[in-house]
Amino acid sequence: MEIKPSRIFSTITIFFLCLLLAHVTSKASSSSLCNGSVAECSSMVETEEMSVIMESWSSQRLTEEQAHKLSYGALRRNQPACDGGKRGESYSTQCLPPPSNPYSRGCSKHYRCGRDS
């Protein structure tokens, strides 16, 4: 069974038009909640905007506070933060990441190194 591309396009177009219609009607119904004066409606909108700002601010503060806390696993005794290495080595030797671009290139003829001259 073969479906024509024009049929798929029309189906997708109808679907998005339905979504657009639902979005527009929901916006229209939410904006028609205020039946008072312009001042009353504007103060109601400002209050709603302020509550959204306050919610985002408080959630941002909570995430910032949680980012600075240590986990209980980090507080265990005799547990190095990294692999630790051999006995007698400092714990921090294994914490360094491997070099991102180690030098592994040879000497080309262009540079006329001592061995190629």
Swiss-Prot record:
GO terms for molecular function: hormone activity. GO terms for cellular component: apoplast. Residues 27-64 form a propeptide. Its main location: secreted. It holds the Pfam family RALF. GO terms for biological process: calcium-mediated signaling; cell-cell signaling; regulation of growth. Glycans are attached at N35. Disulfide bonds join C82-C95, C107-C113. Residues 1-26 form the signal peptide. Residues 77-107 are annotated as: Disordered. It comes from the Eukaryota. The keyword Glycoprotein applies. Proteolytically cleaved, probably by S1P, a subtilisin-like serine protease (subtilase). Belongs to the plant rapid alkalinization factor (RALF) family. Keywords: Disulfide bond, Glycoprotein, Hormone, Secreted, Signal. This is Protein RALF-like 32. Cell signaling peptide that may regulate plant stress, growth, and development. Mediates a rapid alkalinization of extracellular space by mediating a transient increase in the cytoplasmic Ca(2+) concentration leading to a calcium-dependent signaling events through a cell surface receptor and a concomitant activation of some intracellular mitogen-activated protein kinases. The record marks Q60, R61 as: Required for proteolytic cleavage. InterPro entries: RALF (IPR008801). It is found in: Secreted.
